[in-house]
Curated annotation (Swiss-Prot):
Residues 228-250 are annotated as: Disordered. This is Uracil-DNA glycosylase. The active site is at residue 78. Keywords: Cytoplasm, DNA damage, DNA repair, Hydrolase. One of its GO terms (cellular component) is cytoplasm. InterPro entries: UDG_fam1, Ura-DNA_Glyclase_AS, Uracil-DNA_glycosylase-like, Uracil-DNA_glycosylase-like_sf. It comes from Bordetella bronchiseptica (strain ATCC BAA-588 / NCTC 13252 / RB50). It is found in: Cytoplasm. Its EC number is 3.2.2.27. Its main location: cytoplasm. SUPFAM superfamilies: Uracil-DNA glycosylase-like. Transmembrane segments: none annotated.
Length: 250
């Protein structure tokens, strides 16, 4: 039986209100507040009409990190649209879910330089300052992209810009054209590192201009962080996952 990751009525507004102050400040900006109100109205209407919306915790990527805590940003597009998959963290699924193809390619790339991750739940990355943010935070069952163009992009663009404004050094991993379009939100003089490649989907991972396969982004990220006196990310995920599992339960 899949994990019940369905969004409950009124949960989206409650979770937004419970976000850390630094993120709530972004949501309170006038243009962002209007966009979020539009999203919220649409989501609640669809739930009232009987639609199944995922995930149960749309803002989970923000729950554990303030902007100043973020060291790496990985952008996804919208949540997985099957039952029991989406967790509120881009690319991540529960450990008992079959590994999605894009995540499998991510693990393959990590395994070039580090031990291959054994868990599909990427919570350990979040504990180390990796923001796993989709640009649309909700989706309807079996309908990819169903909540795109509803206002989420305005909300998540503002969140990305807030992270980029923070002066602590960060790496932005932009995979695919959708993520790369967000590079404009990262000022060139901000002192951050931007690495771009194709999306890890099997449809594009080996294609030019910059194949995801062989991109070396995980190694490059750690080298850059270490040059700035920061700890490398344990991409294998083992050091934090086991002891923190309960905290990240859906």
């Amino acid at each position: 039986m899949p994990n019940d990751n369905r969004l409950a009525p009124a949960a989206l507004a409650a979770q937004a209100a419970a976000l850390p102050a630094a993120w709530r400040h972004v949501l309170e900006q006038p243009a962002v507040a209007r966009a979020f109100a539009s999203v919220l109205g649409h989501v609640e209407q669809r739930l009232a009409e009987g639609a199944v919306v995922y995930p149960a915790t749309p803002f989970r990527a923000l729950d554990q990190l303030a902007p100043a805590d973020v060291r790496v940003v990985i952008l996804g597009q919208d949540p997985y649209h099957g039952p029991g998959q989406a967790q509120g963290l881009a690319f991540s699924v529960p450990d008992d879910c079959k590994c999605p193809p894009s995540l499998r390619n991510i693990f393959n790339e990590i395994a070039v330089d580090y031990p291959r991750p054994t868990r599909h739940d990427l919570s350990a990355w979040t504990r180390q300052g990796v923001l796993l943010l989709n640009t649309s935070l909700t989706v309807e069952d079996g309908q990819p992209g169903s909540h795109a163009k509803r206002g989420w992009e305005t909300v998540t663009d503002a969140l990305i810009a807030e992270v980029a404004r923070d002066p602590s050094p960060k790496v932005f991993l932009l995979w695919g054209a959708h993520a790369q379009a967000k590079q404009a939100l990262v000022p060139a003089d901000a002192g951050h590192l931007v690495l771009a490649a194709n999306h890890p989907s099997p449809l594009s991972a080996r294609r030019p201009p910059v194949p995801f396969v062989g991109c070396g982004h995980f190694r490059q990220t750690n080298a850059w962080l270490q040059q700035r006196g920061q700890k490398p990310v344990d991409w294998s995920g083992e050091q934090n996952n086991a002891s923190r599992q309960g905290k990240f339960a859906l």
